Amino acid sequence: ALDKIFTYAKEYGKSKGLDIKCYVPTHSLINYTSWQIVSPEASLASLDCVDGYIAQVWTGTAREPNFYNGVQKERVFENAFLEYGCMKSMTAPLNRKMYFLTDPIEDRAKDWLDYKINYQATFAAQLMYPMVDTYEVMPWPDRIYQGLYRIAGTDQKERIPRSYSTQMQTMVNTLNDIRTSDKKITGTQGIGVLMANSLMFQRFPNHNGYDDPQFSSFYGQTLPLLKRGIPVELVHMENTPFKETFKGLHILVMSYSNMKPMKPEYHNYLADWVKKGGVLIYCGEDIDPYQTVLEWWNTDGNEYKAPSEHLFEKMNLSRNPGEGTYRYGKGTVIVMREDPKHFVLKAGNDQKYFETIASAYQKKQGIEIETKNSFIVERGPYTIAAVMDESVSKEPLTLSGLYIDLFDKDLPVLTSKQIQPGEQGYLYDLNKVSGKIKAKVLCGASRIYDEKVSKQSYSFVAKSPINTTNVSRVLLPCKPEKIRVNGKEEQPEWDESSKTLLLSFENDPAGVNVSIEW
């Protein structure tokens, strides 16, 4: 249906001299699988009429509870990180455009503080991917600004608090300046986990007592890495025909305990990658009931008891190799005979899995895997950081420098920022401001128009939704002598260390005129 609709839209646009772009808004494969929904999203990527995707990741999807270390709970940042990564990797080999979505609220009835905390987590997670710089920032704005939601700790409902709308608008405005870059997130690169569309087909119903609580076979492969500060990559099996899929990948973890290969050809690409030097780690007992469904590996003359037997045979192994390490060409195959769900369902049961990966990485790359409890990425003047709980350390992360705190509505200037486990930080690095800039609104809760800079003055028009408060940090060459907001003189709140002026006034969608003289 989408093929017909998008093709018609493009042809109609062409007849009118318009180049119409068509994007598919979709949840991630992770979320659809978790929520037991089947979607054709990956197959749509190959349609010529599809220009890209809108990755619908927000608090509502990212807060789906999962298991780690035997504990089931919400892990919003970690889940969002994996969801955005899943969407990014789905389109990367095809070079399709990707928009990342965040939502300051969600459909479930929670309170404003809950929305704020989880918005920060998903917002930070999306910025961890420097190859994406296009965003959908506010689905259904009327719901955000006019909806009534609970005040934390009470049964009372109110519209969005001024403090939250100010912070949210400041965060959204920064995305106008975010650009793609070659900068990488901190942590050991090149470790991936294989996914496939068939993940969605194994979620329901349970058979013969075999189950996969909260999609634990997937999280068993990913969370033991992510929680140790490794930015695990997700690799889509449907993309293995593209060489770009394996670029920079050193180790690939896979399991057929919760998915199956829909085509035997995928094994050719996996085996070829191993033969050229890749390390493939297979985790699984191959005992789930879906191993015996009538499929290509056990029909039309094929007599494999499990699809993994076909893969192992491709790599000159026996059909059912025991646990151990095997060579194939220049590469390595490591077999672990345990379904990965057990790595997270049982407390402390992921150590052997992690040590297997760490040892394989050290042997292949000649260096140790870096373990830590945080991720940091720098994008221009913006520093994004996340510190995880349930990790290798309970220590906070301390960043030193000269920063504006973008997760604080008052935009304070800091020389040190401490981020606790389970929290995230978003900072404007003032030391990265170009010396060529004389005067500029660095950040704030309104959009800036009609900027005019002269030798001794700076003026602009600020626009933002009604019934919200603007707070802005304005870079100036020196302390101002006169400030006017809509003609009314204001007293300066000046920070000498950063050479910035703090401005605050009532927003107006028609525009607020600001003039500054020094």
Where on the chain are the PLM-derived regions?
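Active-site neighborhood of glycoside hydrolase catalytic domains
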Residues: 1-22
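A short helix->loop->beta-strand "cap" motif at the edges of active sites that frequently abuts
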Residues: 17-20, 94-96, 275-279, 331
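Hydrophobic targeting/anchoring helices
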Residues: 22-218, 319-322, 334-338, 343-347, ...
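A short, well-structured beta->alpha microelement
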Residues: 222-245
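Short, well-ordered secondary-structure micro-motifs within conserved domains or adaptor modules
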Residues: 246-259
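A conserved amphipathic helix/loop scaffold
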Residues: 260-457, 461, 472-473
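Solvent-exposed beta-strand/loop surfaces of large extracellular or lumenal domains
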Residues: 400-417, 484-504
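Surface-exposed interaction regions enriched in Ser/Thr/Asp/Glu
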Residues: 504-518
